[in-house]
Amino acid sequence: MTGSIGQAPAIDKRDFDINRRSSTPHETAAQEDEALLHSRPRSRLSVGNRFSDNDDGLLSDVVEEIVERDRQRMRREVVRVGSFVWGVITCLGAGSITAFSLYGPLLLTRLNYTQLRVNEVSIAAGISMYLPVSLAGYLCDRYSPSPLTLFAGIAFGLGYSLAAFVYKSGPPPDAGGNGWPFWVMVVAFIAIGVATCSMYLAAVTTCAKNFGRGKHKGIILAVPIAAFGLSGMWQSQVGTYFLCERLKDSNCGDVDVYKYFLFLAILLLTIGVIGTFALRIVDDEEEKYIDEAVEELERSGLLAESEFFRPRSEVQAAYGTFSDDHEDNGSVDDQSVTISEELREAARREKEREEEERRKKNWLLNYETRIFLADHTMWWLALGFFLVTGPGEAYLNNLGTIVQTLNLDTTAIVDSHPAGLPSTHVTIIALTSTIARLLTGSLSDLFAPTARRHFTVDQETAGPDPFTKQRPALSRLAFLIPSALLLSLGFLLLASPLPTHHPELSHLTTALVGLGYGSIFSLVPIIISVVWGVENFGTNWGIVAMFPAAGAAMWGVIYSRAYQSAADGSPTDDGQCHGWKCFGFWSIGCTFSVWVAIVAWLVAWTSWRRRGVVV
């Protein structure tokens, strides 16, 4: 009770604790507080209970639970970061096929292959690298990247070992030699292509699922994709300067293809075995993405139409409950159930829950695959990707012979030639594509508008998100289309007469192709993850990534036909082609192909803007 103004408040008897000891003048404040804590009644929940020796069990349990939760969170973070690091290392090795131009010309001169046969080898690798991508993505989404990584390591080891022995055996019988048949080399590169696809997708999917919902998803995906492009650079340098054929003066000549193939076989087998244990998807993140997607489908009303799912509210109301008969006899049953029966019941419920979660995941991923395939914008995006990657892949695979056509003499390529070494061009395209991938990934994160999922009942009439208008932003298509223009500029320069008169310009052509091609390969999977989500990313990206197989095969055949036709009409008898006619018309066709791809992407972009889909 309070007294009058200016007076100290009066103490009522109800404010006084009868259990409190009276303090003596010699008692310290700490001792007085301790006495106060022990003077509280035991029957009340008070702070004193926490300090008593008999009642600290609850506090200890809470502390242990917090420590264990923090330990699990730290363990998950270590797994997430470790998987990302090994995913980047995996991609640094998986892109070995990008160094094909390093040894492609030697297949012409050492094994007496025709240009068409060399392209058949590269096309076999390209088709086998792209066609199984959807299957590999499906396996990553439904199961785990680990088995796929082990399979990739074994396939790499077998493929490169087989290719090494085919090369060492010499020209095949139908080319005037006693070596292994040509089809064995094709089989070897089919295995290499499948392994490339599996290892690359396992690494990228792991990174996408572990970091796919963060604000830095662009750079997280760009780093392993850039590492994939860098693999051709460092591997070609190792082959050129360490695994080379020694000349009489102890200098390096051409790459020793036999040793180079064996080196790749051992390296990639090791990466695959380690990746079996290192590439892991954090379960909590994947379950969170699945649950969020299911909840969004429920809100949109689409999930209620499914024969598989009931509304979540009904499931929660029925989950863990029993019928009225069980409730009436609950007390009797509780007394009769033994501990072992309770454990069996708990295990059964846990198994049922896991089965339900697995069925939910499979249903959702299948449903999202159907949505993805039914979306016409996906086909416009894939068409543009087909028209762009075909010329890009053909340029990468035939870079070695393109460089040779610009050297008008028939001697071996040396540093003094203005067109440069094939390994130099492989390095240029690897560096420029890596820089482009990292820049576009980081810049798209910085300037792209905030993405949102677009599971709506009427996607075509859905308005734009008002939140995205609050700040200036650049769509990822604003980066994709200029990248395609850079790629077309590279082919346009190659189609002009300038490179034949100034072979040093071939370095600029390679740089432009690397910048454009690298940016496109970085942005397209990022766009897929933004528009259609990361829950089914492996399958969705795998479907789109199949299209370059047809494009690479088509433009590779066109190039080899033009090259061989020009070589047959050449006055020299070295079986090689020199001059503009070897690649000129092919380059013009590649330029127009990229321009048509830009139109296809503009159509997709227009549709996304009309829907309100933020890209």
Swiss-Prot record:
SUPFAM superfamilies, per this entry?
A: MFS general substrate transporter
The transmembrane segments are 84-104, 120-140, 147-167, 182-202, 218-238, 261-281, 371-391, 428-448, 477-497, 512-532, 538-558, 583-603
Write out the coiled-coil annotation as residue ranges. Answer: none
Q: Which domain of life is it from?
A: Eukaryota
Residues of this chain annotated as glycosylated in UniProt: 112, 329
Listed A to Z, the keywords are: Glycoprotein, Membrane, Transmembrane, Transmembrane helix, Transport, Vacuole
Start and end residues of each stretch annotated as Disordered: 1-35
Q: Which GO terms describe its molecular function?
A: transmembrane transporter activity
Gene Ontology cellular component?
Answer: fungal-type vacuole membrane
Which compartments is it annotated to reside in?
Vacuole membrane
For bias type Basic and acidic residues, the affected ranges are 11-20
* One protein family per Pfam: MFS_1
Q: Which InterPro entries match?
A: MFS, MFS_trans_sf
Give the function comment from the record.
Probable transporter.
* UniProt family annotation: Belongs to the major facilitator superfamily.
Q: What is this protein called?
A: Probable transporter mch1
Task: Report the source organism.
Answer: Emericella nidulans (strain FGSC A4 / ATCC 38163 / CBS 112.46 / NRRL 194 / M139)
Q: What is the lineage of its organism?
A: Eukaryota, Fungi, Dikarya, Ascomycota, Pezizomycotina
